């Protein structure tokens, strides 16, 4: 008796299992669906990752202890009133900061999303920034790298981003992904891993022309940096980026006023 028919059945069953486990090319969050079609279906895993990190970021911002910073500790501060709070997690030190940006929430979200590739023009810490793909208007994959900052040499990131309108504001979330077709043009830079990054933009109830902004980040900088060194500088880097970002929006507002 030949075993060929039985072998074929096993192969067919295995094939069916693989096909059934294929990543769904669609993602629905807050009543908005990102649909990947054609060649963009190769980014389905990245889209799934975005769904996961968005849920984590939203949970952090919605936690009843977030605004009071219960469970966080004060990490860094400056003379402009900026304060970084931190908490240690199994993946490393998570940091968060809140600030007020001098533009309406819709404009802040639009600039943050669409202005990504212009970051090196005004942020001295960013060496390069580019979109790898933008399969939908709410989901993209980007690469960017920073210059040497403090004791940390330049790092490269490849991450997927997603945003949604939530209530009268917005939430943006990002996490590192692997894109097999992407080849870095920046040899020598260590590829860091972004476990989680998120921003929440809300209109200021006392002044709708400004935006209340919360940012959270957890990253593994990789390389040979001791954990102690990373913990010492990550909050300071967040302070620097916050000050730079706020000044950027102040400059944008000034240009609009002058025009």
Curated annotation (Swiss-Prot):
Keywords on this record?
Answer: Signal
Q: Which Pfam families match?
A: START
Please, one GO biological process term?
Answer: vesicle tethering to endoplasmic reticulum
Q: Which GO terms describe its cellular component?
A: endoplasmic reticulum-endosome membrane contact site; late endosome membrane
Q: Which InterPro entries match?
A: StAR-like (IPR000799), STARD3 (IPR051869), START-like_dom_sf (IPR023393), START_lipid-bd_dom (IPR002913)
Domain START per the UniProt entry, residue ranges: 43-254
Single annotated GO MF = lipid binding
Q: Which residues cross the membrane?
A: none
The stretch of residues making up the signal peptide is 1-20
User: Can you name this protein?
Assistant: Steroidogenic acute regulatory-like protein 1
């Amino acid at each position: 008796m030949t075993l060929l028919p039985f072998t074929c059945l096993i192969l067919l069953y295995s094939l069916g299992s693989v096909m059934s486990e294929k990543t769904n090319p669609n993602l629905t969050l807050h009543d908005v669906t990102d649909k990947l079609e054609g060649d963009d279906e190769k980014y389905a895993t990245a889209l799934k990752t975005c769904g996961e990190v968005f849920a984590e970021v939203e949970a952090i911002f919605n936690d009843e202890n977030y605004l009071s910073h219960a469970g966080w500790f004060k990490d860094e501060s400056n003379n402009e009133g900026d304060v970084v709070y931190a908490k240690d997690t199994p993946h490393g030190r998570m940091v968060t900061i809140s600030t007020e940006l001098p533009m309406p929430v819709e404009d802040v979200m639009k600039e943050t999303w669409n202005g990504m590739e212009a970051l090196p023009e005004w942020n001295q810490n960013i060496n390069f920034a580019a979109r790898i793909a933008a399969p939908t208007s709410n989901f993209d994959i980007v690469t960017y790298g920073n210059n040497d900052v403090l004791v940390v040499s330049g790092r490269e990131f490849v991450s997927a981003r997603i945003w949604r309108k939530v209530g009268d504001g917005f939430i943006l979330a990002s996490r590192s992904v692997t894109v097999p077709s992407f080849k870095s043009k920046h040899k020598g830079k260590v590829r860091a891993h972004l476990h989680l990054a998120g921003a929440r933009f809300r209109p200021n109830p006392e002044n709708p022309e400004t935006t209340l902004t919360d940012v959270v980040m957890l990253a593994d900088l990789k390389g040979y940096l001791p954990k102690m060194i990373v913990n010492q500088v990550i909050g300071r880097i967040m302070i620097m980026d916050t000050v730079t970002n706020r000044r950027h929006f102040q400059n944008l507002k000034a240009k609009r006023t002058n025009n």
